[in-house]
């Protein structure tokens, strides 16, 4: 999504993913043996996610107490982008009328990176559920690939300065 939308006015660049959780649709994270530990070991930086409890570590406490996989995929997608140097933080997950299907929405800076982060987050969570770990080579590759997307889509220094000045003055802009 680009521009103000149903999900947010303040965060105009959003990935909207329709996620069918299949076998884990009715399981909360506390019902998956070893999932919390595997997630916290794989992405220890998730400790910085506040989530609804409103404090550092809030998201991981939700995972420990039990939250649904769509919510976890949202946070993992955001964290993978953060590890690649992209300042993102907005996300929402909502159940649809179709059982086991969720709408997962999260912010991106670079659209290709956002799409990649969505796929990588699903892959990472699925691996933790089925094997209890995420291969270290994959964990190194994902942020590296995301950083490449970020760098490929980055503005040059002079254009960046013009864009920041326009934003300060609340002048709209569009990437052409």
Task: List PLM regions with ranges.
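Preference for protein termini
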Residues: 1-175
């Amino acid at each position: 999504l680009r521009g103000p939308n149903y999900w947010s006015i303040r965060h105009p660049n959003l990935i909207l993913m329709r996620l069918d959780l299949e076998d884990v649709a009715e399981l909360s994270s506390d019902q998956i043996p070893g999932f919390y530990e595997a997630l916290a070991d794989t992405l220890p930086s998730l400790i910085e996610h506040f989530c609804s409890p409103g404090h550092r570590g809030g998201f991981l406490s939700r995972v420990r107490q039990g939250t649904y996989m769509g919510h976890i995929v949202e946070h993992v997608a955001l964290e993978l982008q953060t590890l690649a140097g992209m300042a993102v933080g907005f996300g929402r997950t909502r159940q649809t009328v179709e059982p086991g299907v969720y709408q997962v929405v999260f912010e991106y800076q670079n659209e290709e990176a956002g799409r990649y982060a969505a796929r990588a987050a699903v892959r990472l969570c699925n691996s933790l559920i089925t094997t209890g770990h995420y291969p270290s080579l994959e964990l190194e590759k994902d942020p590296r690939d995301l950083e490449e997307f970020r760098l490929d889509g980055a503005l040059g220094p002079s254009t960046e300065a013009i864009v920041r000045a326009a934003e300060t003055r609340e002048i709209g802009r569009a990437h052409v």
